[in-house]
């Protein structure tokens, strides 16, 4: 297997984002742009990874090192162009590798297939390989100049002639170099251009003049699209969501209106699941086969068991684990709770820091009072228990198997197995008193 050093350029300021957050840390599907790129690079077989940081260097470094442990970080102190940025990783380039793969950290839709296609050309003898795409409107992109079927140069639009601007074959931003020639080619790049910057793209013309083998590989535009502003971020996120929905549907997931469903990068959904419109999947969600996620539900950090029913209008928060055939109904919020098989929380409830057994029913309006302003406390409810409507369960608390809690109760003490607990004031009924009350109240109103 060929060894590969991949260098990710993540030093740009991203001024057009109009944000204090470094551009590469903006997120698509809950994952920073640069991490999307790193993920695909790993899948494409890179054995070494270097990331060049600049604007927001400390924040970018922290995110990257949290995402992947084995990474070299280099800082570009001055913004002198893309070739200068790559040379900031000189120490990595001095190591002996077969391939050097250079990509931009703001291209989150990049796919391993495109990266592998570029690397394949190095494997068969190319010294320089560029990814290119055909654009219906090439405005803003560098143009690929060919002669006799050979790529001879890349010219940036600001430096292109009127004739060159008519070319629709554009630079896709992925560059691969023969590892033995990479450093020497980079050191030959000069800054003789309108911006006096060291362009990475000049490597193509340098290699061509030296008679080296230069190749171009066509890749789909949606694989290499870059992010420069918040609208482009939205467009890229929308495309990512379409890809995810398509992959899920082809794997056997039914999504009734996919354009209204939002997935995170790590969402796992098994075949046979049905997802109704307007559902949000935050980070860390796994949905097992046969489950139904009804409309307007919000899930994050939750595991949904086989054949479970969620919603509509349900909120599953981090730490939620639902066993087989659990039902979480309308306007219910569940947080950091394990719910046993076939248990039901059907209406208007908050269940937090709890463990509930199998085939237990939680009545409408029940809440767990798990926080005293300083600490969170846990409640444990056994199997086959029945919690009546409008009950307040004050943690810490244990309710035994088969126990029954009367509606409207405030329960503050443990309830043994197969017991019944009342925790409410006794009802007082005054017969025929309503008519007297109306007379008294109407008299008070007339005096005013």
Swiss-Prot record:
Matching Gene3D superfamilies: Hexapeptide repeat proteins, Spore Coat Polysaccharide Biosynthesis Protein SpsA, Chain A
UniProt-annotated binding residues for acetyl-CoA: 364, 370-371, 389, 407, 424
Organism: Bartonella quintana (strain Toulouse) (Rochalimaea quintana)
Protein name: Bifunctional protein GlmU
Annotated region (N-acetyltransferase), positions in chain: 252-448
Pathway: Nucleotide-sugar biosynthesis; UDP-N-acetyl-alpha-D-glucosamine biosynthesis; N-acetyl-alpha-D-glucosamine 1-phosphate from alpha-D-glucosamine 6-phosphate (route II): step 2/2; Nucleotide-sugar biosynthesis; UDP-N-acetyl-alpha-D-glucosamine biosynthesis; UDP-N-acetyl-alpha-D-glucosamine from N-acetyl-alpha-D-glucosamine 1-phosphate: step 1/1; Bacterial outer membrane biogenesis; LPS lipid A biosynthesis
InterPro entries assigned: Bifunctional_GlmU, GlmU-like, GlmU_C_LbH, Hexapep, Hexapep_transf_CS, MobA-like_NTP_Trfase, Nucleotide-diphossugar_trans, Trimer_LpxA-like_sf
Catalytic site positions: 347
Quaternary state and interactors: Homotrimer.
Keyword Cell wall biogenesis/degradation part of the UniProt annotation: yes
Residues engaged in binding Mg(2+): 106, 228
GO cellular component: cytoplasm; membrane
Family: In the N-terminal section; belongs to the N-acetylglucosamine-1-phosphate uridyltransferase family.
Catalyzed reactions per annotation: alpha-D-glucosamine 1-phosphate + acetyl-CoA = N-acetyl-alpha-D-glucosamine 1-phosphate + CoA + H(+); N-acetyl-alpha-D-glucosamine 1-phosphate + UTP + H(+) = UDP-N-acetyl-alpha-D-glucosamine + diphosphate
Function: Catalyzes the last two sequential reactions in the de novo biosynthetic pathway for UDP-N-acetylglucosamine (UDP-GlcNAc). The C-terminal domain catalyzes the transfer of acetyl group from acetyl coenzyme A to glucosamine-1-phosphate (GlcN-1-P) to produce N-acetylglucosamine-1-phosphate (GlcNAc-1-P), which is converted into UDP-GlcNAc by the transfer of uridine 5-monophosphate (from uridine 5-triphosphate), a reaction catalyzed by the N-terminal domain.
């Amino acid at each position: 297997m060929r060894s590969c050093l991949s260098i990710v350029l993540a030093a740009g300021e991203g001024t057009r984002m109009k944000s204090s957050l470094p551009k590469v840390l903006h997120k698509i599907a809950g994952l920073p742009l640069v991490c999307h790129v790193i993920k695909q690079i790993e899948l494409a077989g890179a054995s070494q990874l270097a990331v060049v940081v600049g604007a927001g260097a400390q924040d970018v470094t922290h995110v990257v090192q949290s995402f992947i442990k084995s990474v070299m970080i280099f800082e570009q102190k001055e913004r002198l162009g893309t070739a200068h940025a790559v040379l900031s990783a000189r120490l990595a380039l001095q190591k002996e590798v077969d391939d050097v793969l250079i990509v931009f950290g703001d291209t989150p839709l990049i796919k391993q297939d495109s990266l592998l296609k570029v690397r394949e050309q190095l494997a068969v003898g190319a010294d320089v390989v560029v990814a290119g795409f055909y654009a219906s409107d090439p405005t803003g992109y560098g143009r690929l100049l060919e002669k006799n079927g050979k790529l001879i140069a890349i010219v940036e639009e600001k430096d292109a002639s009127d004739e060159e601007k008519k070319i629709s074959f554009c630079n896709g931003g992925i560059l691969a170099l023969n590892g033995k020639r990479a450093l020497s080619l980079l050191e030959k790049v000069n800054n003789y251009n309108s911006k006096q910057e060291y362009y990475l793209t000049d490597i193509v013309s340098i290699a061509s003049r030296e008679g080296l083998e230069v190749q171009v590989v066509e890749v789909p535009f949606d694989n290499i699209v870059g992010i420069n502003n918040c609208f482009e971020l939205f467009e890229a996120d929308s495309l990512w969501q379409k890809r995810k929905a398509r992959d899920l549907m082809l794997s056997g997931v039914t999504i009734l209106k996919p354009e209204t469903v939002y997935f995170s990068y790590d969402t796992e959904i098994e075949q046979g699941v049905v997802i109704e419109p307007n559902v949000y999947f935050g980070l860390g969600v796994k949905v097992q086969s046969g489950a139904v996620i009804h409309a307007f539900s919000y899930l994050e950090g939750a595991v949904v068991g086989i054949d479970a029913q969620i919603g509509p209008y349900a909120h599953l928060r981090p730490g939620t684990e639902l066993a087989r055939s659990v039902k979480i109904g309308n306007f219910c919020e569940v947080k950091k709770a394990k719910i046993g098989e076939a248990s039901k929380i059907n209406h208007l409830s908050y269940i937090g820091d709890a463990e509930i057994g199998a085939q237990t029913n939680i009545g409408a309006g029940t809440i767990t009072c798990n926080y005293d302003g300083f600490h969170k406390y846990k409640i444990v409810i056994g199997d086959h228990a029945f919690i009546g409507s409008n009950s307040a369960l004050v943690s810490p608390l244990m309710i035994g198997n088969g126990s029954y809690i009367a509606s409207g109760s405030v329960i503050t003490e443990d309830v043994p197995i197969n017991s019944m607990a009342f925790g409410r004031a006794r009802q007082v009924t005054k017969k025929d008193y309503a008519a007297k009350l109306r007379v008294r109240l109407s008299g008070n109103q007339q005096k005013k």
